[in-house]
Amino acid sequence: MPPTRTFGPITTEMLVRYAGASGDLNPMHYDHEYAQAAGYRGVFAQGMQLAALLSTYGAEQLGPRSVRRFGVTFRSQVWVGDIVTGSGEVTEVTTSDTGVRVVLRLALTTQEGTLAVAGEAELEVPTSLWESAETQPQTLTAQGVQ
């Protein structure tokens, strides 16, 4: 699997756009004065926005249609200006008559190495697709095996 995928830097515009799209209108995510008055150093990314970035990295491994399960735990805040990197490792591969199931342990870390989001994804692809990917791993794309 690719070693990493970088996102960012995180901007206030990204947070405002995500707030509008998701309906998460908590001013902690877009109003700097409000966030500082609440004791934070500034606005910070929505947890679900970070989960979406990590799921993007996970889904890119075998294609978005392969995702069967995805879960995260939020560990630390991501601030405006941070650059986050998705990474992962295969922890389990099982085969059946219909396909190959792959479990990934995922992490989203800041440029300082702080773990922001920990996650796990379960992906499943038809055996024929997996065999093609194993013989030509460089052909894996966000749409699956080319």
Where are these regions (language model features)?
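Hot-dog-fold acyl-thioester-processing enzymes
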Residues: 1-66, 128-146
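HotDog/MaoC-like acyl-thioester-processing domains
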Residues: 1-6, 79-146
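A residue-level detector for conformationally permissive "hinge/kink" positions
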Residues: 15, 31-34, 39, 73, ...
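Mid-chain, well-packed structural core segment of small domains
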Residues: 61-88
